[in-house]
């Protein structure tokens, strides 16, 4: 923790043939191996995160926003999460290729052990395992913070995202038809759930990120 802010800790993640392992070397050893760095996001990352998100809101039904919000509003939205929930970026050679964060799933206090996942990957970097790396890190951090359930709400027609979530351990728990209207059509929403721990693991309210990183300053064991 530096000056009351969470430091930009990171872990290097090697992707080879679809597998994930932590690695402290720099560079790419062979063509089929990509080296990514997953780290805590900071205010300096927000412009890159905004540019990744903007096409999702402007051009797709992945986001139910009718266009990206003003950059300042987006920055305020992300900044409000930093001290409480994990907000991560995945970069390669200093370029942010994707980001993910957790946020409250519901408002009432009894839901405090539930969080909602959001993952966004730059269009040219999709299909390279970045979403899996980010999801794994978010889930691992939430488990350490003391969360029990992680949810993701996916537009029904986004079948690739539904398949992705099922591949990384989520199960469909609900489907709500015609919940949103965008781009001239009604859209159903699939609710997916990942259980992070059993009912006995959550005797206290979850920690905040700022509390976790007072005691533990590294992301390395997330991928241990």
Q: Whereabouts are the PLM-identified features?
A:
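Conserved acetyl-CoA-binding loop-helix of GNAT-fold acetyltransferases
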Residues: 127-140, 163-167
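Conserved beta-strand-loop-alpha-helix junction that forms the acyl-donor binding cleft
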Residues: 152-162
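Conserved GNAT acetyl-CoA-binding A-motif
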Residues: 142-154
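A short beta-loop-alpha structural element at the N-terminal edge
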Residues: 37-49
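Conserved catalytic-core motifs of GNAT/GCN5-like acyltransferases
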Residues: 101-104, 151-154, 171-188, 197-198
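Conserved GNAT-fold acetyl-CoA-binding loop/helix
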Residues: 50-77
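Acetyl-CoA-dependent GNAT
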Residues: 68-124, 135-136, 195-196
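C-terminal "cap" of GNAT-fold acetyltransferases
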Residues: 178-224
